A protein has these predicted regions:
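N-terminal interaction/assembly modules
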Residues: 1-91, 138-145
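N-terminal positioning helix adjacent to the helix-turn-helix/winged-helix DNA-binding module
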Residues: 81-84, 95-97, 128
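DNA major-groove recognition helices of helix-turn-helix
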Residues: 85, 125-136
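Short coil/turn residues that cap or connect secondary-structure elements
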Residues: 89, 93-96, 124
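Short amphipathic alpha helix immediately N-terminal
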Residues: 93-107
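Short alpha-helical "recognition helix" segments of helix-turn-helix
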Residues: 113-116
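The short coil/loop that forms the "turn" connecting the two helices of the helix-turn-helix
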Residues: 119-120
Length: 145
């Protein structure tokens, strides 16, 4: 794989993580709607009609359940992807370069934080990263994107 393809493969976890985070936020909003109080609409004319005896949160329950199932599935996929990426990073066989890749692609650290943690100059961390990317071996069946 090329340098850019390997970086894209390792970056998949970040985007999957963001998707899970987004689903959690959607679920939180739905739960907030279900648990919130309903307002009165004064714009419509008052018409005598039969009142619904269903609780107002009932209409959100199905949506919440579907979103929870989707979230559960995405979390499972996220954990599997994380394991795959850990395996790929482990193929580098150099502890410092593995740390650079782990900090960057699993922990989502900024370059300056990685350099500070490892007590290296940021430019040297870039050099280690470039070399580590070239050493990563990705299984054929793992090459999804």
């Amino acid at each position: 794989m090329t340098y850019d393809e390997t970086k894209a493969y390792l970056s998949q976890y970040y985007y999957a993580y963001q998707k899970v985070d987004s689903l959690k936020e959607e679920l939180r909003c739905l739960e907030e709607l279900a648990n919130g109080t309903q307002g009165i609409n004064y714009d419509e004319p008052v018409v005598q009609k039969s009142r619904s005896l269903k609780a107002p949160f009932i209409r959100y329950i199905d949506r919440i359940q579907k979103k929870e199932e989707e979230l559960s599935q995405k979390v499972e996929e996220l954990l599997n992807l994380k394991d795959e990426i850990h395996e790929a990073i482990a193929t580098v066989n150099d502890p410092v370069m593995e740390l650079v890749l782990t900090y960057r692609y699993i922990n989502f650290w900024e370059w300056c934080d990685i350099a500070s943690k490892l007590h290296y100059a940021e430019s040297y961390v870039y050099k280690l990263h470039r070399k580590a990317i070239s050493l990563v071996l990705i299984k054929e069946d793992s090459k999804r994107q």
